Structures are given as structure tokens and as C-alpha cells.
Amino acid sequence: MRKLYHFPIDPASRQARIALAEKKLKVKLEQIDPWQTNNEFMSITPEGVPPTLVDLVPGGTITICGARAICEYVNEGSSRHPLLPEERSARAESRRIAAWFDIKFSQEVNAYILHEKIEKSFSNLGPTDTQTLRDGREHLDYHLSYLTWVLEQRDWLAGDTFSLADIAGVAHISCLDFLSEINWKNWSEVKRWYQTAKSRPSVQGLLTDRLPGFRAPRHYTDLDF
């Protein structure tokens, strides 16, 4: 059976899990703490961070590291439930938005909020820096404004169908939602999209994830909040 090394409240790991679930591929989940040295895991992946997928194939195993590589790998492995649109321009747009989340959103939002709230907690890096959190939240508002503009024109982030763009988006947004970082009253278009994405079985499986010392908001598991 396939094995996915992951961390629950990690946008990259969540993307891999959603993609595998969309393709209805069975996988064994192995939780990895990214901030602890794990020699066994380091022997599997040079990056030393999740997600990493180990796939059993005839003649041995294949190891795929990183959310983008895993998502593309599982999408190309089967034609059922495609994760990219049919049109070439739409495929390019889906990949663009996925990269926007993984690079720009990650650097300007997650590097502030997830670092302060989760990484510091697990790494014993000291108290939360409130100014860093304020900066991250200001950046988050900018990104949510951009998402609102996109979703006023489309049903999904890259067009008419659920794609890798939405997988990346819901993976990032759901981690922030777990930490009660989004005031949904202010973001109705993003909320509509998020509710629809949360209703997919591939995403519902993430909503039971928990971390020691953290409590998800009441609406987190509610599909119609």
C-alpha cells in the first residue's frame, strides 16, 4: 500500500491528502513532526519535510517529495476524476493559482501566522510575537481580497471545475481556519467557495485532524456554517 508521510495542520501535506482522496487511492498515513529529527524519514527524503509519498510499483517503490510533485503524480496516474481542466489555458491557470498559494501566500501569510502559532509551539521557540501576527493578518486580508475578486468571476478558483488550484487553496485556508484566523462575516465569496470545497469527501477527511494544545473553532467541521 502507498504510504504518505505528513503533518496534519500543514498546507502541503493536506494538498497531497486531498489529491489522493479525489483519485480514490488508498494510502496509509504516517504522521511526521517536521521540527524533530527523524533518521528513518531523512533516509527516505532528502528534504526531510513532509509530505512524502512512497508508492509501491511493480519491481520496487517510487518516492515522491513535495505537494506539487505528489499532486501531479497522482493526477497523471489515472484519468478518472481529473485534477486539471481540459483546456490548456485553464490548466495553466490552475497551476498558476496553486503556485500562488504555495509561494506568495505561504511567504506572506503562513510564514507569519502558522510559524507563530504552530511552529513556535512545537519547537519551543519562545512566546508568540503579536506584531508578527498582526502583519500576517494584514497580509491575509490582502490575499482574501484577491480571492474574492477571482471568485466573483468563477465558480472555482481556476474556472468551472474543481482542480489543483482549489486543492491548494482549501489546504492553505483550512489550516488558518483551524486556528480561527478568518472572520468569515467579512468574506462572503470566499466563504461560499470554502463551504462547497469542504463538502467534498476528499476535504471532509481533514476536518477531524487535531493538534495537542489546540482547539478548532466550532464551525470548523460544520459544512454549512
Predicted features and spans:
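Acidic/histidine-enriched, glycine/proline-rich intrinsically disordered or flexible terminal extensions
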Residues: 210-225
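A generic structural-conservation signal
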Residues: 29, 160, 186, 206-207
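GST-like domain detector, emphasizing the conserved glutathione-binding G-site
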Residues: 1-130, 134, 224
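Positions that flank functional sites
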Residues: 34-35, 162, 212-213
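Active-site-flanking alpha-helical
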Residues: 75, 172-173, 207
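Short, solvent-exposed turn/loop segments enriched in Gly/Ser/Thr/Pro and often Arg
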Residues: 7, 164, 210-211
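GST-like fold's C-terminal all-alpha helical module
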Residues: 101-199
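A late-sequence structural motif
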Residues: 200-201, 205
